Regions:
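Active-site-proximal segments of catalytic enzyme domains
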Residues: 95
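A cross-family detector of function-defining hotspots
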Residues: 3-4, 14-89, 99-182
Length: 182
C-alpha cells in the first residue's frame, strides 16, 4: 500500500477536494482541511498539524503555466505539495511525520536522497541572507521534485520536500528552462 505522501502526490493535477485530502491525512490526526479562500488564481492550503502546504491554482492558470490541459472546468487544481520541517516557515514546529516517496524521511541526508532518486538535474549550493544550504531537484515524468537542505552546526537538515507540476522553485522556468520549463 502506498504511503499517504505518495497518495497525496498522486493528486497533483487533480481538483482539490478538502474531504479527500482530510481523509488521507486522518491517520496523522487531521480532522479538517480548509477550502480555498482566494479571489486570485492561486491559493495556499496549510495543514500545520502535519507540516504540509498545498499550492492550488485555478484551472486556466495551471493550464497556462504548465502548457497542459488538466481540466476544462474552472475549479481548483493541486499544483504542488510541500512536506515541511522547522525552518521552512514560521508556522511549522515539527517535521512532516510520515514517510516520503522512495522510503526516505525528513531526516534523510542529501546522499540518501540522491541514492533514492538518482543523480539530480539541479544540485546547487545556496547562500543568501538568512539561509545557506543545498537544493537538489529532479525532473521525473509529469512531476518535478525539489529537496532543500539547510546547513546546521553539525550537518545538513532537510527543511522541505516539494513535488510539483511546474518549477518547484519559481526561478527554474527562467534559470534552467531546458530542465524545468513545461
Amino acid at each position: 500500500m502506498k504511503e499517504p505522501s505518495e497518495r497525496l502526490i498522486d493528486m497533483l493535477g487533480h481538483p482539490y477536494n478538502q474531504r479527500n485530502v482530510q481523509a488521507l491525512l486522518q491517520s496523522f490526526g487531521v480532522k479538517h482541511m480548509p477550502p480555498p479562500n482566494s479571489y486570485f488564481n492561486d491559493d495556499i492550503i496549510w495543514s500545520v498539524k502535519t507540516s504540509i502546504r498545498i499550492d492550488i491554482y485555478r484551472a486556466p492558470k495551471i493550464n497556462d503555466l504548465t502548457g497542459r490541459k488538466y481540466t476544462n472546468q474552472d475549479g481548483w487544481i493541486i499544483g504542488a505539495i510541500h512536506f515541511l520541517a522547522p525552518g521552512s516557515d514560521d508556522r511549522i514546529k515539527a517535521p512532516f511525520p510520515g514517510k516520503l516517496p522512495n522510503g526516505i524521511t525528513m531526516s534523510a541526508t542529501p546522499d540518501e536522497s540522491i541514492k533514492a532518486y538518482g543523480q539530480p538535474e539541479l544540485y546547487e549550493e545556496c547562500w543568501w541572507p538568512g539561509f545557506s544550504g543545498r537544493i537538489l531537484a529532479w525532473r521525473k515524468p509529469g512531476i518535478n521534485i525539489a529537496i532543500e537542505y539547510a546547513d546546521s552546526e553539525v550537518d545538513r537538515v532537510m527543511r522541505s520536500y516539494t513535488a510539483c507540476l511546474i518549477g518547484c522553485i519559481g526561478a527554474w522556468r527562467d534559470d534552467n528552462p531546458d530542465i524545468f520549463a513545461p
